[in-house]
Amino acid sequence: EPCTDSPLFGLEEVVVTPHLGASTVEAQDRAGTDVADSVLKALAGEFVADAVNITGGKVDEEVARWLDLARKLGLLAGKLLDDAPVALNVTARGELSTENVESLGLSAVRGLFSGIVSEPVTFVNAPSIAESRGLDYSVATETEARAHRSALEVKAVAANGATATVVGALTGLEAVEKIVRINGRGMDMRAAGRNLFLRYTDAPGALGKVGGQLGDAGINIEAAALTQAAKGDGAVLVLRVESEVPEELETSIAESVGAQSFQ
């Protein structure tokens, strides 16, 4: 039977875990390895499926594939706002809607606040940060998914009433994470690498100004995508760049095309 009374229990340097119930050396070794792997995931901010203090319920393999994309969509939706977020609505569409997707909402909240607060945002503290910041977040499902078998939609609402909606999907045999819609307009951009976002009123020559300044600074553009701007509405240009864009250059680019920008 496990020890129930020891002076070691009172030491701050000692972390006590529940009795593993492993009756053989091999079982104890495997159980210990599993615990160590879970600790490493938690320290890296990754999702720990068997953690007792994470909300969201059981996470199946299919849902787990979407966790990182949900985080990125939450971060992007928050960046597109020009005021503090007060609500975040996450909707799983298509085949994904048949799964338990509560954890995807949690991951999106984590992404949203990772671009706002200075402290690390984890699956454990994300709900408490949301509560302290007055954020109302929800998770819903819809059977319909435009152009994809499954898609994840994240809508952020700002205190001033402005909204930002981004949609992502896992595409191809390798399940490549992509951003497929921003504010109702289609695009096709990998959700990876270092990206420069510009929200501006599209005009002839604007794209050339942006590319020219980046080229003059020796910054290579690996990929680019531009939303289809509706008449009188702003466009969103996404540039995946090889290196970080200095703040002064980012400001100069934004001013040259009358844009709001972020990386």
Spell out what each predicted region is.
Residues 1-80:
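Rossmann-like dinucleotide-binding domain for NAD(H)/NADP(H)
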Residues 56-263:
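A conserved regulatory-domain signal marking ACT and ACT-like small-molecule sensing domains
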